[in-house]
From Swiss-Prot:
GO terms for biological process: L-histidine biosynthetic process; methionine biosynthetic process; purine nucleotide biosynthetic process; tetrahydrofolate interconversion. This is Bifunctional methylenetetrahydrofolate dehydrogenase/cyclohydrolase 2, mitochondrial. Its EC number is 1.5.1.15, 1.5.1.5, 3.5.4.9. The gene is MTHFD2L. Pathway: One-carbon metabolism; tetrahydrofolate interconversion. It is a peripheral membrane protein. CDD domains: NAD_bind_m-THF_DH_Cyclohyd. NAD(+) binds at G214, R215, S216, R247. It is found in: Mitochondrion inner membrane. Its main location: mitochondrion. The keyword Magnesium applies. It comes from Callithrix jacchus (White-tufted-ear marmoset). Its cofactor is Mg(2+). Signal peptide: none annotated.
Amino acid sequence: MTVPARGFLLLRGRLGRVPALGRSTAPPVRAPGGPRSAFRGFRSSGVRHEAVIISGTEMAKHIQKEIKQGVESWISLGNRRPHLSIILVGDNPASHTYVRNKIRAASAVGICSELILKPKDVSQEELLDITDQLNMDPRVSGILVQLPLPDHVDERMICNGIAPEKDVDGFHIINIGRLCLDQHSLIPATASAVWEIITRTGIQTFGKNVVVAGRSKNVGMPIAMLLHTDGEHERPGGDATVTIAHRYTPKEQLKTHTQLADVIIVAAGIPKLITSDMVKEGAAVIDVGINYVHDPVTGKTKLVGDVDFEAVKKKAGFITPVPGGVGPMTVAMLLKNTLLAAKKIIY
């Protein structure tokens, strides 16, 4: 079954805000017939059913509605409309698709956007000059450089060239550092998307075992930081016991960890890395993977994640699909960061 859109609103309405992921004394998912029978759609007793499929598309629609209301409220107070500047280098089809989606989503919530398109042979110096100009432009709330960049450009230098307070991707060294110190920051959008999926779905992490497969500085590491840190700190964390796996983790060792995990988050870029024998009954599986593979049935290329979805959904308690899971949520959290940057809440 797929979680309906209203389920997210009901969950928040019943439990209130859950900043510390699982600090509620009452579990968010009740067995049928309990005092909160409205939650029976999330679990069932008796015969084992397939996992609840978490619709990131539907959840993102609700978040975008919240952002749109926030933008309208901000403007009604006489403030400038939030403005997102996107720098796109080269002609990578996937990057162009991602940027179009971001521009379309920004428009839908009332955020102005502009696209600065540069050829793949653009110099690093020119890109830094552009970020400097945008940093000083008072009308620009947020700046995003679509990755990856060409090999001759130092991505870290470009990301650090964006002012931290306008770094809506959350990749600046100051934002990453503040995240690691449990301080408020602009959080990388994909990590924030995973966090939001967990909290809005009511997946428990307090004292639970979590495996994060993938240690990239923009995805895996920020996700692990959010989930293992103290729920009582300035920027509340998930209070989970987190294991990080990576390319040098032997498959059998990874399997040992995932079989014990209550939550598995996969961001490795390897199709079908997680199979059903690696997942314990009722675990939550969040698939961040983006892979394009050949479909032997249609003869075309299709998008898949890192999880063997059809097999794992028969065993997991919750699962996100690809497409339609973390992807739409990542765009929504980018827009949320843009509004936060415009309101100067963090910096």
